[in-house]
Curated annotation (Swiss-Prot):
Region described as Disordered: spans on this chain: 31-106
Keyword annotations of the record: Calmodulin-binding, Cytoplasm, Cytoskeleton, Golgi apparatus, Lipoprotein, Palmitate, Phosphoprotein
Keyword Cytoplasm in annotation: yes
Name used for this protein in its record: MAP6 domain-containing protein 1
GO cellular component: cis-Golgi network; Golgi-associated vesicle; microtubule
Species per Swiss-Prot/TrEMBL record: Mus musculus (Mouse)
Annotated function: May have microtubule-stabilizing activity.
Length: 191
C-alpha cells in the first residue's frame, strides 16, 4: 500500500511546466533586466532607447495576458524592467520632453455578476481542480479537562505554611463485588 500524498508537492512538480501566468497570484517583476519575451538585436535596442514613441507603439501593439491578481483587482502595471515605459511617463509641469501634464487615469475593474461562463474563465486551473480530501478524521477536542483540587484545611490562604501544614489523607478502598456488605446490617424492629 502506498503512502498518501500529504504535501501535494508531487502534484505541483508534475504540473509546474503547465502553469500559465494567471496561476501566479503576485505579478513577478525583474528589476534592471529586459523582458525575456522582447529579445531584439543590438541595433533595434539602440533605436528604441533613442525614440520612446516607436518602442511604445511596439509595446502597445503586442497583447499582454493579465494575471489573476490583475483580473481580480483591476491593476494595470507597466512591463517589468522596460525602460521605455519609465521614459514615457509625463514628467510634470515644465518637463524636459514638453509633454502635457495630464493627471494619470485610474481604471476600476468590476467583476462580472450573473454570468456563469465569465466566472469559470476568471478562476484558475487549480481553483477548478480543487477537491477536498476524503477519509480525514476530525481533530480531537482541545477543551481542557477540569482538574480537581484537594484542600486539607478550610481557612484558605495561610501566610505561615509550616505551622498549619497537614498531610492530605489518602483513602484506599479495596474493591468489593458485593454491595450487600458495604452498608451496616439492618436493625431489627421491636414490635
Amino acid at each position: 500500500m502506498a503512502w498518501p500524498c500529504i504535501s501535494r508537492l508531487c502534484c505541483l512538480a508534475r504540473r509546474w511546466n503547465q502553469l500559465d501566468r494567471s496561476d501566479v497570484a503576485v505579478p513577478l517583476t525583474l528589476h534592471g533586466y529586459s523582458d525575456p519575451g522582447s529579445e531584439e538585436s543590438g541595433a533595434d535596442c539602440s533605436v528604441s532607447r533613442g525614440n520612446p514613441s516607436v518602442a511604445g507603439a511596439r509595446e502597445s501593439s503586442r497583447a499582454v495576458p493579465l494575471t489573476q491578481y490583475q483580473r481580480d483587482f483591476g491593476v494595470r502595471t507597466a512591463r517589468a524592467g522596460s525602460r521605455d515605459a519609465a521614459q514615457e511617463r509625463p514628467s510634470g509641469p515644465g518637463g524636459r520632453r514638453g509633454q502635457s501634464s495630464a493627471p494619470p487615469t485610474r481604471t476600476v475593474y468590476v467583476l462580472p455578476v450573473g454570468d456563469a461562463d465569465a466566472a469559470v474563465v476568471a478562476t484558475t486551473s487549480y481553483r477548478q481542480e480543487f477537491q477536498a480530501w476524503t477519509g480525514v478524521k476530525p481533530s480531537r477536542s482541545t477543551k481542557a479537562r477540569t482538574a480537581r483540587v484537594v484542600t486539607t484545611h478550610s481557612s484558605g490562604w495561610d501566610p505561615s505554611p509550616g505551622a498549619s501544614f497537614q498531610v492530605p489523607e489518602v483513602r484506599k478502598f479495596t474493591p468489593n463485588p458485593s454491595a450487600i456488605f458495604q452498608t451496616s446490617a439492618p436493625q431489627t424492629l421491636n414490635v
